[in-house]
């Protein structure tokens, strides 16, 4: 037997005991192969091979945030079987319509903590228009609670529930495949200075997002990708329009 395929008799890291390794290999075989057998994903396996084209050094997110551009947030909430929440904040250049991620927050927060994090986002980004929050049933209680306590959550009127589904994810224009088109056309400006130089297993919001987008759909985690998509949906619905193209020379994007 190829020794690479064997599970170690003694786990190399207590965070991944033998039983967890076996479960990971059974439930996420491609992710296991990438993470524990060092078999890299090919471009044909990735949904977003053009993502690195958007990496732009020298962008200071604080400067972008202070420009007063329309800002949108997507929120992927934890569920009964999945811990962790992600808040993804994007500013949109009203002239070129290019999208600039300016803040990515991750945390294992309870409902009041999620609300507090959103309040902080609303305070830091006064031009925040919409907070698009995933709603698959379990999260509805949080959404209702935020809207029913406007005194405590003064951003309540900006919260909109978004229901995900397979058809939404695979739609070539509005779903995740459409995001690859936007990456290819450099409609997103990714501030690479936020994560370049970080250690390989850095768990900051930026590094986790870059890994998840790079490995999607084969990676074990996808929370940041979905929060990114919810922010994109907020832009499409309440922003300046849907991106349909951008010239290689940097011309303004069209809308429809």
Predicted regions and their residues:
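Charged alpha-helix within mobile-element recombinases
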Residues: 212-235
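Short coil/turn segments at secondary-structure boundaries
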Residues: 31-40, 46-53, 134, 191-196, ...
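Acidic two-metal-ion nuclease catalytic site recognized across multiple nuclease folds
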Residues: 104, 229-256
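Short hydrophobic beta-strand segments
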Residues: 72-74, 187-190, 245
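ATPase catalytic-site recognition across NTP-hydrolyzing enzymes
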Residues: 4-75
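Gly/Thr-rich phosphate-binding beta-strand-loop-beta motif of the actin/hexokinase/Hsp70
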Residues: 65-92
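Mg2+-dependent endonuclease catalytic cores in nucleic-acid-processing enzymes, primarily RNase H-like
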Residues: 2-15, 43, 88-216
């Amino acid at each position: 037997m190829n020794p690479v395929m064997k599970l170690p008799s003694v786990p190399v890291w207590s965070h991944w005991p033998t039983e967890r390794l076996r479960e990971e290999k059974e439930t996420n075989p491609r992710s296991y192969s990438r993470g524990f057998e060092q078999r890299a994903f090919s471009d044909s396996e990735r949904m977003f091979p053009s993502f690195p084209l958007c990496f732009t050094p020298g962008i200071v997110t604080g400067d972008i945030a202070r420009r007063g551009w329309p800002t949108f947030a997507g929120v992927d909430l934890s569920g009964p079987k999945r811990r962790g929440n992600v808040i993804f904040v994007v500013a949109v250049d009203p002239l070129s319509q290019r999208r600039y991620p300016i803040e990515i927050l991750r945390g294992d927060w309870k409902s009041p903590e999620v609300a507090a994090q959103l309040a902080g986002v609303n305070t830091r980004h006064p031009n925040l228009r919409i907070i698009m929050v995933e709603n698959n049933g379990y999260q509805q209680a949080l959404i209702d609670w935020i809207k029913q306590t406007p005194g405590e959550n003064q951003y309540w009127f900006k919260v909109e529930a978004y229901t995900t589904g397979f058809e939404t994810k695979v739609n070539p224009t509005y779903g995740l495949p459409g995001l690859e088109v936007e990456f290819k056309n450099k409609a997103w400006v990714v501030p690479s200075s936020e994560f370049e130089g970080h250690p390989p297993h850095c768990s900051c919001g930026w590094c986790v997002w870059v890994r998840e987008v790079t490995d999607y759909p084969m990676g074990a985690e996808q929370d940041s990708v979905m929060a990114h998509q919810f922010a994109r949906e907020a832009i499409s619905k309440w922003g300046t329009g849907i991106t349909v193209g951008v010239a290689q020379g940097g011309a303004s994007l069209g809308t429809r």
